[in-house]
From Swiss-Prot:
Cited Pfam families: Psb28 (PF03912)
Similarity comment: family membership: Belongs to the Psb28 family.
Name by which UniProt lists this protein: Photosystem II reaction center Psb28 protein
Keywords linked to the UniProt accession: Membrane, Photosynthesis, Photosystem II, Thylakoid
Any GO BP annotation: photosynthesis
Bilayer topology: Peripheral membrane protein
Signal peptide: none
Location(s), subcellular: Cellular thylakoid membrane
Keyword Transmembrane: no
PANTHER family: PHOTOSYSTEM II REACTION CENTER PSB28 PROTEIN, CHLOROPLASTIC, PTHR34963
GO cellular component, as recorded: photosystem II oxygen evolving complex; plasma membrane-derived thylakoid membrane
Length: 104
């Protein structure tokens, strides 16, 4: 089963995922938005995407605040090669199936 974690053993589900690919097709990014976190937001250092193939990680995390109140985390996962892109898509297929997520 595929999962996303900020803290070991605490699975999270994003509110939104946007996937972007360059016009040349060489680079891509996935931007995850998390509004309702189970993890302690004070101790988040990175995001792990885990499935049967292994683990994908990123430390590109930004907290969003409104009037001093936490609203969301935005996490960016960058892909530099076609192999990284394909691996990410395989993870997202597994993750979306496990969490009843669809594409809009």
């Amino acid at each position: 089963m595929a999962s996303i974690e900020f803290s070991p053993g605490i699975q999270e589900v994003p509110t939104q995922v946007r996937v972007l690919k360059s016009k040349t097709g060489n680079r891509g990014s996935a931007i995850f938005r998390f509004e309702d976190l189970k993890s302690d937001t004070q101790n988040i250092l990175g995001m792990r995407m885990i499935d049967e193939e292994g683990e994908l990680t990123t430390r590109n995390i930004r907290a969003k605040f409104l009037n001093g109140e936490f609203k969301a985390l935005e996490v960016t996962y960058d892909m530099e090669t076609e192999a990284e892109w394909d691996r990410f898509l395989r993870f997202m297929e597994r993750f979306s199936a496990a969490n009843q997520m669809g594409m809009a």
